[in-house]
Every structure is written in C-alpha cells, then in structure tokens.
A protein has these predicted regions:
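Conserved small/polar residues in nucleotide/adenosyl-binding loops
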Residues: 210-217
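Iron-sulfur-associated redox domains of electron-transfer enzymes in respiratory
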Residues: 1-163, 169-172, 177-179
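Mobile "lid/hinge" segments at catalytic clefts and subdomain interfaces of large enzymes
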Residues: 184-185
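Assembly/oligomerization interface modules of large self-assembling protein complexes
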Residues: 204-209
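Long, compositionally biased charged/polar accessory segments in the mid-to-C-terminal portions
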Residues: 194-203
C-alpha cells in the first residue's frame, strides 16, 4: 500500500494562491485507508478551502486514482466542473496525482498529499515501511524480510556488528533487520542462504517502462 499524508494547509494554499475555482480529487484505496484522501478527507479539505475564500466546484473519489483508463472514464463525470475550474487539487498519492495529470491536459493539478513509502498497516492510523521498490527484490533468499528497507545501512551481506540485544545501533527503537532475517531463515531451515556472498546493490539499475509491461510478455508464453 502507498502511504501518504496531507501536506500542511499553508503549502496547499501556496499552490492555489492564484486559483479561485478548484475541483478536488480523492482516492478510495490507499489514500482513503491512510485518512489522507478518502471522501471524509476530501470534504474536510473542501471546508478548509471555502473558509479561505476558494470556490470548490465539485469533487470525485476515484477508485483508484492510479488506474489510468478507469480514472479517465470517471473524470468525465466532472466534465462541466473541470471546464470551469482554475485548477485541480489531488488528495491521492504521487502516482495517483500523476495519473490525474495525464488525464487532464489543459488544467493545473496540484498535490495535497506527501507520499511517504510503500508499507503496511500495523494498526489503525499507524503504518510501517515495507518496501523501497528497488526494482531488484531480495526477499527470495532473506526469508521474506527486506534488508534494503529494514536495515538502516541497507546491508546485503549480514549485520554490521553494531546491533545490541537484537536492536539496530542507529536507533534502539528498531529491530536489527539481519537478526530478524537470521531468525526467519532458521525457522524455515534456510540458514545456508547466508553463506553466499551477494554483490553490492546496483542502485543505478533503472526501473523502466519495460518492467511495467512484463505482464504482457508473460501472457505471451
């Protein structure tokens, strides 16, 4: 899930300083779960903007905002409002906001949210980072625990030696990723995975459009 949070209202108003009429767009999936862009949050934003003298012509909660074709269809329901608006304010994640931009060629689209990370819900209102979308997943040999995300140093070949009582030396609030990986591999009888020396992570590897079309290649097999 994409974790996002609302930008400070002053930053949002800065985007809209020359805007009188605005349309609001939310997302019924990740942003709704994060309480940053569901219908409730869109209505709160509407109220906040109207207090500041803005005219909100309408709103739509996309499901989801990041589906290019579906969003294009759903946004047609706001055709008249969009034609009269000075700008669109997106309460979706960065991906959803860019999807909206692709569907609305002739009107500015501004973000109301900051996209934080890919993560999971620990409990209501509390989220934990789980993936950095590095494009070269390591989970297959680490027991499903990500060293790139969980290790503060992003180490690939085991712990740094600074962990104490299972906690990271960078922050005692965090578990040592490699202790967790060791324990997991022990549980599933795959400790031999730690004997192989892994190459340094290649962060120059581009995540290109080719990756996004991989499903088409697989469907041709």
């Amino acid at each position: 899930m994409i974790i996002s949070e609302n930008k400070p209202i002053n930053e949002i108003l800065g985007f809209l300083k020359n805007v009188e009429k605005v349309v609001l767009i939310g997302c019924n999936q990740c942003a709704a779960i994060c309480k940053s862009g569901g219908e409730e949050e869109v209505l709160k934003m509407k109220e906040a903007l109207e207090i500041e003298g803005k005219t909100v012509l309408g709103y739509r909660i996309l499901d989801p905002a990041c589906n290019l074709l579906k969003s294009k269809k759903d946004l047609k329901e706001l055709k008249s409002e969009l034609a009269d608006a000075d700008a669109v304010l997106s309460l979706a994640c960065g991906d959803g906001t860019q999807t909206i931009v692709k569907n609305l060629k002739n009107i500015p689209v501004y973000p109301a949210n900051n996209t934080m990370f890919i993560g999971e819900t620990k409990r209501i209102g509390e989220f934990e980072e789980a993936c950095k979308a590095c494009g070269d997943c390591e989970l297959g040999w680490t027991g499903g625990i990500c060293p790139v995300t969980m290790c503060a140093k992003g180490l690939i070949n085991g712990a740094c030696g600074g962990a104490k009582n299972g906690k990271c030396e960078v922050s005692q609030d965090n578990d040592c990723a490699w202790v967790k990986i060791y324990e997991r591999l022990k549980d599933i009888d795959q400790l031999d995975n730690l004997l192989e020396i892994r190459p340094m992570k290649d962060y120059s590897k581009p995540v290109s459009y080719t990756h996004l079309r991989a499903h088409e290649t697989l469907s041709d097999l």
